[in-house]
């Protein structure tokens, strides 16, 4: 993740009047980096990396970004003054000794199998999507760890300062003691069979919300003190084989009128489903008529080893057992047509496999909600690829549906907070399913299995519909102007306008951004606060993009809609 402005791509060391003096001062660094550059493997952008390294050292920058350069290694001597190092989306298999001053390390999306000793000053560690089997000793000041999507089998002792720990999709079988400082924990998709005692804070702000996400494990036991947590705490235990006794006990205790403990979410079933998956090609061909199955099978055999293929196969089998599959006319044909599109687009297939990987085998309505999301993925992909380039009205309709679904998700999220005992999937699906006709939601299934236990009332639905229509009237055009598929259309069909808008944005970055961020921090009394600076920077950037993209959106829509008689605003 980037936390600084893009570098000046026109920077040239040869143009720097005091380069010779500087290069003498840092001769050892420059010599080592030049030697490292000459050892580049094919495809590595080490020349750009060295330019960035020298610029950082000469200017004594505190931040160094070497993202997306296809680097297989880093030089042994990094600039010693840096506090922030970003090296994401490379091909790194190891890291050199890290600067003693380092506070922020983002090394996600690499091939790291080990980490070096971490500096004592480190506060933020992001190593998502690597090949780590263990973490080194953790610094005492560390506040944030993201080690999702690795191969961790155990964790070291956690520092007492730790506030965020995310280790989703690993192979953990147990957790160490959790520190009292912890505010967010995500250990979803591991092999945990139990949880340690949850830290109970004696003193913390009532505004601090604490989240423990432990879904998709093998948890059969929960700590005895779990109900002693504050109402500001949320614990997600869905898709774990909790015994019926524990589920009944949780249900009874959290339903008491005087209950003031945490919000606890767990699945209605015990999760003891058969986890054997049949071959992907077999699961796919089952959706097609017999005269097509042989050809379809040959095509899909080629995708058997793609990431998430097994879970996608299981998802298709569970989808065939949903209420919609059993009762909705034309549903099988709809799924078959969608599968044909997936077979011809590797990008769409990859996206869809990833979405389906989040579906559980133990909850029918989660499968139904995932099907909704997959249909959204298809439509957004088609829009981004140009399907609606010549049909602005259809693109607006699609955007309007995506906007309505976003608002419903916000409403569902707020509703979930009011319920102690609930499978949140039922709440999200209830709003989409029950309002599908009134809000013209083409991607939503028309039936769900557990609406009766969703906690969503008729009054909730009426209020939600009114809120969606009100926010659509006031916010849709601003939202649409920032929508990715619309930007893709503008780049292809309005190249000159798009280029002008981008030029405006970068002029603002160069001439106004820093001052506007500084003014905002000064007004709020937060000058020098790094977190506040990042937040203020994001706000300024969004406001700028909103203004610039809204202007070009208004111009293009006014022209196109006047030509075909369409309207931007309708119910």
UniProtKB/Swiss-Prot annotation:
Its EC number(s): 2.3.2.27
Active site positions, chain numbering: 363
Biological process according to GO: modulation of process of another organism; protein ubiquitination
Enzymatic reactions: S-ubiquitinyl-[E2 ubiquitin-conjugating enzyme]-L-cysteine + [acceptor protein]-L-lysine = [E2 ubiquitin-conjugating enzyme]-L-cysteine + N(6)-ubiquitinyl-[acceptor protein]-L-lysine
Region of interest (Linker), ranges: 269-278
SUPFAM superfamilies named among the record's database cross-references: L domain-like (SSF52058)
Single annotated GO MF: ubiquitin-protein transferase activity
Region (E3 ubiquitin-protein ligase catalytic domain): 279-571
Chief location: secreted
Entry's Gene Ontology cellular component terms: extracellular region; host cell cytoplasm
Domain (NEL): residue spans on this chain: 279-571
Entry PTM: Ubiquitinated in the presence of host E1 ubiquitin-activating enzyme, E2 ubiquitin-conjugating enzyme UBE2D3 and ubiquitin.
UniProt keyword list: Host cytoplasm, Leucine-rich repeat, Repeat, Secreted, Transferase, Ubl conjugation, Ubl conjugation pathway, Virulence
A Pfam family reported for this protein in Swiss-Prot or TrEMBL: NEL
Region (Interaction with target proteins): 1-260
Xref: NCBIfam families: IpaH_Shig
PANTHER family membership: OLIGODENDROCYTE-MYELIN GLYCOPROTEIN, PTHR47114
Record's comment describing the protein's domains: The LRR (leucine-rich repeat) domain forms a slightly curved solenoid and may mediate interaction with target proteins.
Protein name: E3 ubiquitin-protein ligase ipaH3
Native species: Shigella flexneri
Gene symbol of the encoding locus: ipaH3
